[in-house]
Amino acid sequence: MIADFEGDIRNLIDTKVEGEIPVLATRNMVMFPGVITPLLIGRESSMKIVKKMQKDPSVIIGVFCQKQSDIEYPTYSDLYDTGVYARIIRVMEMPGERGEMTIILQGLGKCKLDSLTETKPFLKGITTPIMDVLPDTESWEFKSLMKNLHQTTAEYIKKNEDMPDESRFALKNISNDVVLVNFICANMTFSVKEKMSMLEENSLEERIYTTLRTLNKEISLFDIRNSIRDKTREDLDEQQKEYFLQQQIKNIKEELGKGEGSYDKIELEKASMGKMW
């Protein structure tokens, strides 16, 4: 899901929160500041958080990713301690007996999970806001860095068959640099650990450099995989040619002597050159 932001991004990501707040634990999904994110909700405790947010849309929650996705009842040590504040935008209940729902969350500012204070009926915790250090977006250095990020991400999307067309559209149409950087971090097919290393960077410039290193590494891996695939295809083509040539020689043998006699292989290959196969 794509959403741009007009105006001073600090108004969105400078989040003030006091006291304990609901904590939503996610599996294999890392939220980033300013990014709108759809999320499938299936856990009963998570559904209770959503119902609370539906009653009061002003409720702000903390979203933290689990270190291991198979843990059903995460504790403090099971969560990465860097996450994002979020506010609910929309809830869509899914058909079926399982009662799952998809929620749309607006990412706000970054935060640190200091402690979990409750586990039932859902997780609650104490958090500390973390304000990213934003650069001068009008400086020549930052514009050059963003241009590099644009070009490298476009190459990554082109070579990654798993990336949806929406990503190309976003790259062209998100005008806010902070939102674009965080959108790339959130939506490229990086691992959770790679995304967390990006989120944990408190400087936007350093986050871009971390993202560029990951993008370039992935592009190199794509190139290696494609090279291996092309080489394998060439080897297979040569094997097929050799097989068809041997079959042709066999057929010529049968035509000339029903398989009898001792035609030289070179002569047979010469004779086969005029055949269609």
Regions found by a protein language model. Give the residues of each.
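N-terminal low-complexity, acidic/polar interaction/targeting segments
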Residues: M1-W277
